[in-house]
Protein backbone atom coordinates (compact mmCIF):
# COMPACT_ATOMS: atom_id res chain seq x y z
CA UNK A 1 0.00 0.00 0.00
CA UNK A 2 1.14 3.56 -0.73
CA UNK A 3 0.03 5.72 2.19
CA UNK A 4 -0.15 9.51 2.13
CA UNK A 5 -0.21 11.24 5.52
CA UNK A 6 -2.55 14.16 6.08
CA UNK A 7 -0.91 17.03 7.97
CA UNK A 8 -2.54 16.18 11.30
CA UNK A 9 -1.66 12.50 10.86
CA UNK A 10 2.01 13.38 10.35
CA UNK A 11 1.97 15.58 13.43
CA UNK A 12 0.37 12.83 15.53
CA UNK A 13 2.80 10.25 14.11
CA UNK A 14 5.70 12.30 15.42
CA UNK A 15 4.15 13.62 18.66
CA UNK A 16 1.65 11.02 19.86
CA UNK A 17 1.12 7.96 17.62
CA UNK A 18 -1.51 6.65 20.06
CA UNK A 19 -3.90 9.29 18.64
CA UNK A 20 -3.88 7.30 15.39
CA UNK A 21 -6.28 4.36 15.04
CA UNK A 22 -4.40 1.06 15.61
CA UNK A 23 -5.21 -0.24 12.10
CA UNK A 24 -3.79 2.93 10.51
CA UNK A 25 -0.80 2.91 12.87
CA UNK A 26 -0.01 -0.69 11.89
CA UNK A 27 -0.30 0.18 8.19
CA UNK A 28 2.08 3.14 8.58
CA UNK A 29 4.58 0.96 10.47
CA UNK A 30 4.36 -1.94 8.01
CA UNK A 31 7.66 -2.06 6.06
CA UNK A 32 5.79 -3.44 3.03
CA UNK A 33 4.00 -0.10 2.70
CA UNK A 34 5.50 3.12 1.37
CA UNK A 35 4.53 6.22 3.34
CA UNK A 36 4.64 9.76 1.95
CA UNK A 37 4.46 13.27 3.39
CA UNK A 38 3.73 16.22 1.15
CA UNK A 39 5.77 19.39 1.09
CA UNK A 40 2.30 21.00 1.31
CA UNK A 41 1.84 19.51 4.80
CA UNK A 42 5.20 20.86 5.93
CA UNK A 43 4.17 24.29 4.61
CA UNK A 44 0.75 24.11 6.31
CA UNK A 45 2.25 23.11 9.66
CA UNK A 46 4.97 25.74 9.29
CA UNK A 47 2.37 28.46 8.79
CA UNK A 48 0.64 27.39 12.00
CA UNK A 49 3.99 27.60 13.80
CA UNK A 50 4.60 31.11 12.45
CA UNK A 51 1.17 32.21 13.73
CA UNK A 52 1.87 30.79 17.19
CA UNK A 53 -0.83 28.12 16.85
CA UNK A 54 1.51 25.13 16.92
CA UNK A 55 4.88 24.07 18.26
CA UNK A 56 6.83 21.97 15.79
CA UNK A 57 10.41 20.80 16.15
CA UNK A 58 12.74 22.38 13.60
CA UNK A 59 13.93 18.89 12.66
CA UNK A 60 10.40 17.75 11.73
CA UNK A 61 11.24 16.81 8.11
CA UNK A 62 14.40 15.01 9.22
CA UNK A 63 12.52 13.01 11.87
CA UNK A 64 9.90 11.98 9.34
CA UNK A 65 12.66 10.84 6.97
CA UNK A 66 14.28 8.85 9.78
CA UNK A 67 10.96 7.00 10.14
CA UNK A 68 11.17 6.08 6.45
CA UNK A 69 8.52 8.59 5.37
CA UNK A 70 9.26 9.87 1.88
CA UNK A 71 8.75 13.47 0.79
CA UNK A 72 6.27 14.01 -2.03
CA UNK A 73 6.89 17.28 -3.91
CA UNK A 74 3.93 19.36 -5.07
CA UNK A 75 4.03 19.62 -8.87
CA UNK A 76 2.25 21.66 -11.53
CA UNK A 77 0.15 18.58 -12.33
CA UNK A 78 -0.94 18.45 -8.69
CA UNK A 79 -1.83 22.16 -8.76
CA UNK A 80 -3.94 21.76 -11.89
CA UNK A 81 -5.70 18.76 -10.35
CA UNK A 82 -6.38 20.76 -7.15
CA UNK A 83 -8.04 23.65 -8.97
CA UNK A 84 -10.11 21.17 -11.00
CA UNK A 85 -11.59 19.41 -7.96
CA UNK A 86 -15.31 19.64 -7.16
CA UNK A 87 -15.88 22.19 -4.38
CA UNK A 88 -16.61 19.71 -1.56
CA UNK A 89 -13.66 21.01 0.43
CA UNK A 90 -12.84 24.68 0.88
CA UNK A 91 -9.44 24.36 2.56
CA UNK A 92 -6.73 24.92 -0.08
CA UNK A 93 -4.20 22.74 1.75
CA UNK A 94 -6.63 19.83 1.93
CA UNK A 95 -7.55 20.30 -1.72
CA UNK A 96 -3.85 20.16 -2.63
CA UNK A 97 -3.34 16.98 -0.61
CA UNK A 98 -6.44 15.34 -2.09
CA UNK A 99 -5.23 16.22 -5.59
CA UNK A 100 -1.88 14.61 -4.85
CA UNK A 101 -3.66 11.46 -3.65
CA UNK A 102 -5.65 11.33 -6.86
CA UNK A 103 -2.72 12.02 -9.18
CA UNK A 104 -0.37 9.57 -7.45
CA UNK A 105 -2.95 6.85 -6.60
CA UNK A 106 -2.25 7.05 -2.88
CA UNK A 107 -4.29 6.00 0.16
CA UNK A 108 -5.01 9.08 2.30
CA UNK A 109 -4.40 8.57 6.04
CA UNK A 110 -6.74 11.19 7.48
CA UNK A 111 -9.51 11.93 9.94
CA UNK A 112 -11.04 14.42 7.50
CA UNK A 113 -14.49 13.07 6.60
CA UNK A 114 -14.85 15.34 3.57
CA UNK A 115 -11.91 13.62 1.86
CA UNK A 116 -14.09 10.56 1.21
CA UNK A 117 -16.28 12.70 -1.08
CA UNK A 118 -13.50 12.58 -3.66
CA UNK A 119 -12.32 9.62 -5.75
CA UNK A 120 -9.64 8.54 -3.30
CA UNK A 121 -9.10 5.67 -0.91
CA UNK A 122 -9.12 6.79 2.72
CA UNK A 123 -7.38 5.08 5.63
CA UNK A 124 -9.23 6.43 8.70
CA UNK A 125 -6.95 7.58 11.48
Describe these PLM feature segments.
Residues 57, 69-114, 120-125:
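Active-site neighborhoods of divalent-metal-dependent phosphate/nucleic-acid chemistry enzymes
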Residues 28-29, 64-67, 81-82:
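Helical cap/lid subdomains and adjacent loops of hydrolase enzymes that gate the active-site channel
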Residues 1-37, 50-62, 104, 113, ...:
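Short, well-structured N-terminal submotif of metal-dependent ribonuclease cores
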Residues 37-38, 74:
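Short glycine/serine/threonine-enriched helix-capping/active-site loop
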Residues 45:
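Phosphate/NTP-binding elements of NTP-utilizing enzymes
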Residues 12-13, 48-49, 85-86, 100:
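A generic structural signal for short
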Amino acid sequence: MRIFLDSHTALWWMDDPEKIHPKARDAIRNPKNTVFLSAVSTWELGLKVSKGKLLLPSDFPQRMAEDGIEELPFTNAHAIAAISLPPFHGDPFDRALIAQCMEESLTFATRDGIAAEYRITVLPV
